[in-house]
């Protein structure tokens, strides 16, 4: 169900398609225990989940579980299957490893997926059927539709912002909403009171962190 794979870019935790999240978390704990003293606290790994679209809402819980075990997820890789993906993993690792922000100067079309371990900034539109998975925040200088998942590494402090926030789905850490912003009004989505709220830029009120 879970295993580690060493590549030239570092260690990757591969999670095969699954039905029960608790079984996956237990399997991760067991595998790390089995590896004895291989890891040191704070070691960074990459995460790849087979059929990630099916399990996107579980990613924050998996990242949090790994952090509790002393491991930090530096990047999240996309793949439909685990077997035969080594070359794809290497290509994606070279483009994302140790990068704090990813800037995209184009529209993201339907069927395209952008994955990055940090913040994602898009100078263009995110069309219906497109998806962004970001470890940090997502800012779109254009119309944002499709699915945007933020805070997969950063957690609840991440935000999703756009000049026109008309997304099909917004996820920040473990919170999900299908609400949209006011049409043609620059808006920002953030976690407040244990839920995602969407507010105009000029009226946004962030929850104070302790």
Swiss-Prot record:
Superkingdom assignment: Bacteria
Pfam families per record: MinC_C, MinC_N
Claim: Cell division is one of the keywords in the record: yes
BP terms from Gene Ontology: cell morphogenesis; division septum assembly; regulation of cell division; regulation of cell septum assembly
Keywords, comma-separated and alphabetical: Cell cycle, Cell division, Septation
UniProt-listed NCBIfam families: minC, PRK13992.1
Cited function: Cell division inhibitor that blocks the formation of polar Z ring septums. Rapidly oscillates between the poles of the cell to destabilize FtsZ filaments that have formed before they mature into polar Z rings. Prevents FtsZ polymerization.
Assembly notes: Interacts with MinD and FtsZ.
Family, similarity comment: Belongs to the MinC family.
PANTHER family: SEPTUM SITE-DETERMINING PROTEIN MINC
Protein name per its UniProtKB record: Probable septum site-determining protein MinC
Source organism (scientific name): Thermotoga sp. (strain RQ2)
Gene of this entry: minC
